[in-house]
Amino acid sequence: MRAFQRYGLEHIVLCPGSRSAPLALAVGALIEESGINAYTAIDERSAAFMAIGISAASGKATIVITTSGTAVSNLLPAAVEADRSCLPIIFITADRPLRLKGCGSNQTVNQEDFLVPVCREVFNCPSIGLHEISGRSFFTLVKKTWEKAHAYPGPVHLNIPIEEPLHASFLEQKEVCNGWKPLNFEEIQLPISTVSTNTRIKTKEVPELDPSQPGIILAGPWRGKPSQLLGFRKAVKEFQSFTGWPLFADCLSAITIKQSGLISFWELLISAQIFESNDKLQVLRLGPLSCSRALESFLRNTNKKQVLITEGEERYLDPLHLAKQYSGGLQSWLKIFKSNYPNLNNNLVNDDTNILEDLLNKNQLVGDLVDKYLKEDSKITEPSIARKLLDLIPEDIPIMLSASSPVRDFLAYSGFSPFKRRLYSFRGASGIDGNLSLAIGLSIFLGPLVVVCGDLAFLHDSNALLLNQPKKYPLIILLIDNNGGGIFKQLSLAPIFKGSVDKLFSMPQSINIGDLAKAHNIPFRTISSFDELNSALEWSLKLSGPVIIRACTNSEEDTLLRKNITDGLKKYIN
């Protein structure tokens, strides 16, 4: 634990167990001597998601420690998300000795294989024990584990077989804490390299765009290291100023309100066919694709060049198979782009300037009509929450959106408000599991946070309420209760021959959320109007720890409202 701390470890999540007792004792000692941030969690699945939230906010790997057996299998959902979202996390799992494998020994499974498909690396420690290897081998193992988690960020699994006795005596613990080391143990620190070693990133193969022709910039959800964000924003600003291209930015893109050429209602402009694609339109795509079917159709009808830039993400990120990908980051690509056009000045292209001006005007018209539908009515709906919520919360408080409906509604209806603060969502695998735990992890590092989630996402991760975090400031859970998976009401489902949408898809649950909150000693309110929501937010910001605000909505009415807005835009602008 000390060795990891020297490389930058700041947060540990500890799960209970006997086989992992030596690791738990080490964490306890580290808390006393260094004040490292350590948290406990009885549910390994929730623990792992919380750790991902911390890592997403900090940019550094959080370590999760578990015992052997099924405890390790519970790490898989979070490991999948960390892999797809490129977030560093280290799982340290205690294991039974090799001699107990394959012979029916209790709580002994092939746990070293559980996380292999999604981990950057799986390290199996020598069966002789860590105390029997040389100092150089020991520190090489620590170095490689930390390095693999950060070079191409993602999960790393360190599996440690531990022999009995598992529980050191008081005197043995004291001796270790006072600096005991194995004989001939040379303590060294090896330098860390965080440069990706992936040979598939070939900077010579640089896809090009023509700044003299029309185009748009499409910024998807931000997927990069926190240290890369400032440079990314500067590069976006510079490219947009060179070309005059409009910028369609996802609410999760981390683009700021200061960015020129920003089109906030682009998803509605596309879905209402107010802005349509054509053969001449080029697209600079930044990061993963936004969750919009209208956008996918739009891109399929764009037959010109599409270039996809990722911030070190080495896998191909275009499910449409239309774009040429460059994985070396926007700053790197922009340098090459500028060298190919040395005489390029700001806003050279008049056609693109005209396109931008037209879109800015239409964007304003869309906003006006959306406000007529959503802002002038005090009734709580899912689209109106997306439109109004951010104006009720101080701009220094970040927001997390759960998967499913919230992230889609904020993409469509929130306007410019998301670009005044950071919005988070975990879109790697886009599951509804772990949302509360992820939010808790974010809030541990970021401070006060608001998470918007549906009732099924909330109930799916209700074990997160056992984490009892954060301690000193509020985590406001805005629970949109639409009586099940409301997103299924938005799908074009054919009439069901036997059964019902509720029974087979939406699956409403008869859980009293107020009683659940009371059981966990969590403050709770139900609201039915935006005046009540505003009052509840003011109340919750004065509290510490999780706070639940429940807003009841009607998914069928909200589905019709979304359709009416899109249809109304077609008539209003076209």
From Swiss-Prot:
The keyword Manganese applies. Its cofactor is Mg(2+); Mn(2+); thiamine diphosphate. This is 2-succinyl-5-enolpyruvyl-6-hydroxy-3-cyclohexene-1-carboxylate synthase. Disulfide bonds: none annotated. It is an enzyme of class 2 (transferase). GO terms for biological process: menaquinone biosynthetic process; phylloquinone biosynthetic process. The keyword Nucleotide-binding does not apply. One of its GO terms (molecular function) is magnesium ion binding. Homodimer. Belongs to the TPP enzyme family. MenD subfamily. Gene3D superfamilies: 3.40.50.970, TPP-binding domain. HAMAP family: MenD (MF_01659). Pathway: Quinol/quinone metabolism; 1,4-dihydroxy-2-naphthoate biosynthesis; 1,4-dihydroxy-2-naphthoate from chorismate: step 2/7; Cofactor biosynthesis; phylloquinone biosynthesis. Its EC number is 2.2.1.9. It catalyses: isochorismate + 2-oxoglutarate + H(+) = 5-enolpyruvoyl-6-hydroxy-2-succinyl-cyclohex-3-ene-1-carboxylate + CO2. Signal peptide: none annotated. It comes from the Bacteria. InterPro entries: MenaQ_synth_MenD, THDP-binding, Thiamin_PyroP_enz_TPP-bd_dom, TPP_enzyme_TPP-bd. Catalyzes the thiamine diphosphate-dependent decarboxylation of 2-oxoglutarate and the subsequent addition of the resulting succinic semialdehyde-thiamine pyrophosphate anion to isochorismate to yield 2-succinyl-5-enolpyruvyl-6-hydroxy-3-cyclohexene-1-carboxylate (SEPHCHC). Keywords: Magnesium, Manganese, Metal-binding, Thiamine pyrophosphate, Transferase.
